[in-house]
Swiss-Prot record:
This is THO complex subunit 7A. Acts as a component of the THO subcomplex of the TREX complex which is thought to couple mRNA transcription, processing and nuclear export. It is found in: Nucleus. Residues 101-221 form a coiled coil. InterPro entries: THOC7/Mft1 (IPR008501). One of its GO terms (biological process) is mRNA transport. GO terms for cellular component: THO complex; THO complex part of transcription export complex. Keywords: Coiled coil, mRNA processing, mRNA splicing, mRNA transport, Nucleus, RNA-binding, Transport. Component of the THO complex, which is composed of THO1, THO2, THO3, THO5, THO6 and THO7. It comes from Arabidopsis thaliana. It holds the Pfam family THOC7.
Amino acid sequence: MSVRARRIVSGRSETVAANYAFDPLHDDKIIRNRLLTRTTTTRGEPPLKKLQKKFTSFVIELDKEEDNYSECGRLAKAFLQELSAFEIPLLKSQVVVAANLREKENFNELKDETNRQIMQAQADIEDLKKQLEESKIERQQKEECEAIRKLISAQPPRSETQKVIHELKKEIAELEAENTASWRLLELRKKQFALLLHVVDELQETMEDEQKSMVEEMQRNITADGAEAMSID
């Protein structure tokens, strides 16, 4: 409901409340009290009391056993005039009561419509709350997607990535080839070193054998020389 419609409904509600100020259950009591206390002038008697006096005077005159038709007619006319004057406020009160009843019906209709609009507004508020929550979730998802998109945009193109990967694979292959060659060379060096150690061992054994032979030969020579010297003596 728009702001203008709310103002119209509010103004209409205030008007109804102002025109229908009394509960319907108290209407009869209020009207009866007004009939008993209403005055036609500022300092005059209540209409009901005046009507009662006119009626009493007319009845008293009727009860007289005299030729008083003219007086009875005058009193009857005065009573009818007073009755007519008394009836006018009654008619006005009936009009007011009818107007109040119409206003009451209008007020009830307006109340029902206002309650319906309040319920509709509450339902709309709940729907808006749900939409707001969904909008928050959607906005959060959009922000996350935007962050991912920026992160992806900051990365190099796929072609460059593939090129880098290809270069890395090539370097890895070259390193593997170098590693294989180094391993083979290391194995060769191991074998050569083992052979060298074997040769050294053989040379050492040969040298030891030669030294041993030389020592034995020297000992034999010394022994032979000693024996020869003794024989000469």
